[in-house]
Every structure is written in structure tokens, then in C-alpha cells.
Amino acid sequence: MAESAGASSFFPLVVLLLAGSGGSGPRGVQALLCACTSCLQANYTCETDGACMVSIFNLDGMEHHVRTCIPKVELVPAGKPFYCLSSEDLRNTHCCYTDYCNRIDLRVPSGHLKEPEHPSMWGPVELVGIIAGPVFLLFLIIIIVFLVINYHQRVYHNRQRLDMEDPSCEMCLSKDKTLQDLVYDLSTSGSGSGLPLFVQRTVARTIVLQEIIGKGRFGEVWRGRWRGGDVAVKIFSSREERSWFREAEIYQTVMLRHENILGFIAADNKDNGTWTQLWLVSDYHEHGSLFDYLNRYTVTIEGMIKLALSAASGLAHLHMEIVGTQGKPGIAHRDLKSKNILVKKNGMCAIADLGLAVRHDAVTDTIDIAPNQRVGTKRYMAPEVLDETINMKHFDSFKCADIYALGLVYWEIARRCNSGGVHEEYQLPYYDLVPSDPSIEEMRKVVCDQKLRPNIPNWWQSYEALRVMGKMMRECWYANGAARLTALRIKKTLSQLSVQEDVKI
């Protein structure tokens, strides 16, 4: 009887203490969301990497219904965690593992529905048992948790030691290896999927930040230095962890590396004790984005063709599917615009910002995409995205939307082409038809209802290169996505134009 009474007072106390703490584990990329009766400031919701729990019990004659999170580290022993156990006479507890699965009502344990027929007084021996039992069990739980944490730490340190002893890693980061050597190794590696994770961590944690060069909705972009070379460091805020993970994942797709796609170097999460910084390290291009470049400079016909052809080459490589054991899935960008294309020293483009990209698995014919039709920048959205008629289950639909946006980028480039001393000032597409920050409704009215497109000047017809560019733009802007050019067709047309204009690529 003493043991039963001790458990009766201990388990409700543990459940109440756990509910008071919110029970949330470390936030992860796929955190589990649970109902939480004590999380007033978090809208009665908590996040965990473990399980959701709901429990009902009587304490001092009062009925308590508790919902909370159980961190993964506290789900011990495996398969039958203490926190998830019920007792026929003491409490009713249920653990589950899907979002908000603990929003259920449990029945009060049957033992609490009956009044004891023969109440008895507790003697000294019973009191000792009541006090000692819960204390012993609490110490047992603490010891188990400590052993589990210690085990995971030993496994982690062993992995680090193995990484450091890996001769391939030692070779990758020998002291005389420069940034140029590292980039060359990336370009010539067989997998084309990036550096080993250990090397990425080491590179990221030895970069010295120099100056901030840009800001966006995700965070900041810095110029950094590593072994005498410049790198670009995109620093995500902690609330953008999903975006950081997604972009790093896309950049490390097998066979993605291409001269016209921004070169990925490393990804790392840096914890300074106060907050976590999420880093994405890539090649640095001093000209910045195509948007910045066109605002500062005009371009020659040769420069226009190089920019347009390299952008088409990068997009064609993204869209292309390579079948085989070392194959590459088709990738659609979904946020193509002049601010997401960088200009290299040689006047060529490199497509960047793949955080919203989707990949297509040709074997299963599936697309890894969140169920959200409206993404990207409103000004560059294709008609089918604006009016929500895009077929989200068909990968070609996303490629067609990219082509529409590429046509708008070409319009921005061609306006800045200096032909015979004539050029126009830089403007964004639809600058004369919508406000500086247009809404979906404003863009839909112009693009879908009125079927308007950016103006192509008549004087472009006087120059073969501008005439070809204008014709391609119109074929990129068709309302019917299936009628638009493909990236590969655009690349071939511009390659022929470069030969005609004697452009050295």
C-alpha cells in the first residue's frame, strides 16, 4: 500500500512539473507541434523532437488534464518510456507522434471513481516508503538520462575523431591549400555534390567576415576571407532555419555544379552561446547581382549576349534531368529574377538563391514541394501562378514559369544595351504599369486580365541582336506556358547569335 500511495503522489507531480516547463526539445527542421496546457505565451503550443503527451489524474481530490511535449532525450527506456506509462488506479497517460495528436480527452482512471471502503492511517513505515519511493525513482530517471546523454556525446566525439583521422579530409584541408585549390577540387570531384560535411564545418569556422554586402528577407550577405580568397557568406536568421536547410540541400544535389550556377562551398550552423547563426558559404562575385550591375553599367551587344546566354545555360542545366547512378534530378528555380542572378568577373551570369527550388524525381514522377502555390516575387510571377491555374503535380509547369521570368530578365538586360549610342535607363519589368511593390491582385489584373507585357521598342528591329532578343522575349511571355520556349532552345538560339555577332564566349 505504501508503494501504491508513493507512486500516486509522484507521477502527477512529475507530469505537472513537465507541463510547467513546456517540455519542448531543441527546435529542429521537422519539429513536432503539440498542444500545451501551460504554454500561454506560445498560444498553448510547444515544439519538440520527441513526443506529444496527454495525461489525466486526480491530485488532492482535483481532476487534472495535462497536455505537453516530451523531449526525445527523456523518452527512456526506448520503446516504453516512463512518461508514457499509465496506471489503472493512478493515472491515464497517452503519448503520440504527430502534430497536435494530444488534443484528445482521456477518461479518469477507474480507481479514482470509487471511494476507499476501508481508509487507513499511515504509520512511520508507510511514510518512509512514500517519501523514499519517489526520491529513489527520481534519482533513477536522472541516472538513466545522464547515461543516455553521455552515450550520445561519446558517439559524437568518436565521429569527429574519425573525421579528423580521415585521410581524404586531411588532404582536403592541408595547410597550403588555398581557396582556389578547394574550388578546383569541387569542380573536378566525381560526385559533384560538394565537400564532406567535416570539411564544410572546418572551412566555415575559419572564415573571417569583412563587410556586409547585402540584406534580404532571410538575413544578411557578407564578404568573408578564407586563406587569401574572398567568399560570400549568406547568414540566415534562426527563424529561417527551414530556408537555410532547404537551400543547402538543393545546392548539394548530385551533379548540380555548373559554371553558370553559383558555386556552393559550405553550410554550417554556428552557435555563439546566445543565438544560432546559419551560414551558407559560396563563391564571391564582386559585381554583385545582375540588378546591381545593370543599374551601374550599360552593356554592349557582346555583353548582352554573354549575359543572356550564360543565364540560359545555367537555367538549362537546372532544368535538365540526368539519368543514372550519378544522375541529377530536374530542378525548377521558382524565384528567378535579376536580383537572384550574379555577374561574374568575365561578364557571365551565375544563377543563385535556390531556397525556393523544387526537384523532380523522374523514377517516381514526384516533386518535393510544400503545398503552397504562391511563392517567389510577385512582379516576376507567370500568369498561371498569378491566377492559380498552374498544375502543381506537373514538373514542366514549374519550368515554364521559370521561362516567363527569364524573359523579363532579358528585357531588363536589353534595355541597357548601348547600340549606336542609344540606350535606356534601367527599370524593373512593368515599372510603368504597377507600383514599386505590387500586390498579387495588381499583377493579375495587368498580366492575366489585360494581358499586358513590357514594351519592346520599335528601334530594336534595327539591330539583329536586339531583334532576336525581342522575339525570344515574346515567346517566353505566352499566356499558355506549354507554348513557351524551353531553356535549351533559348540557349541554342543565343549560341547561334553569338556566332553571327562574333562573340567570344
UniProtKB/Swiss-Prot annotation:
Changing residue 77 to A: Decreases binding to activin. CDD domains: STKc_TGFbR1_ACVR1b_ACVR1c, TFP_LU_ECD_ALK4. Residues 1-23 form the signal peptide. One of its GO terms (cellular component) is activin receptor complex. Keywords: ATP-binding, Cell membrane, Glycoprotein, Kinase, Magnesium, Manganese, Membrane, Metal-binding, Nucleotide-binding, Phosphoprotein, Receptor, Serine/threonine-protein kinase, Signal, Transferase, Transmembrane, Transmembrane helix, Ubl conjugation. InterPro entries: Activin_recp (IPR000472), GS_dom (IPR003605), Kinase-like_dom_sf (IPR011009), Prot_kinase_dom (IPR000719), Protein_kinase_ATP_BS (IPR017441), Ser/Thr_kinase_AS (IPR008271), Snake_toxin-like_sf (IPR045860), TGFB_receptor (IPR000333). It comes from the Eukaryota. Its EC number is 2.7.11.30. Residues 24-126 are extracellular. The chain crosses the membrane at residues 127-149. Autophosphorylated. Phosphorylated by activin receptor type-2 (ACVR2A or ACVR2B) in response to activin-binding at serine and threonine residues in the GS domain. Phosphorylation of ACVR1B by activin receptor type-2 regulates association with SMAD7. Ubiquitinated. Level of ubiquitination is regulated by the SMAD7-SMURF1 complex. It catalyses: L-threonyl-[receptor-protein] + ATP = O-phospho-L-threonyl-[receptor-protein] + ADP + H(+); L-seryl-[receptor-protein] + ATP = O-phospho-L-seryl-[receptor-protein] + ADP + H(+). Residues 150-505 are cytoplasmic. It is a single-pass type I membrane protein. It is linked to ACVRIB is abundantly expressed in systemic sclerosis patient fibroblasts and production of collagen is also induced by activin-A/INHBA. This suggests that the activin/ACRV1B signaling mechanism is involved in systemic sclerosis. Forms an activin receptor complex with activin receptor type-2 (ACVR2A or ACVR2B). Part of a complex consisting of MAGI2/ARIP1, ACVR2A, ACVR1B and SMAD3. Interacts with SMAD2 and SMAD3. Interacts with SMAD7. Interacts with FKBP1A. Interacts with IGSF1. Interacts with CRIPTO. Interacts with TDP2. Interacts with TSC22D1/TSC-22. Belongs to the protein kinase superfamily. TKL Ser/Thr protein kinase family. TGFB receptor subfamily. This is Activin receptor type-1B. It comes from Homo sapiens.
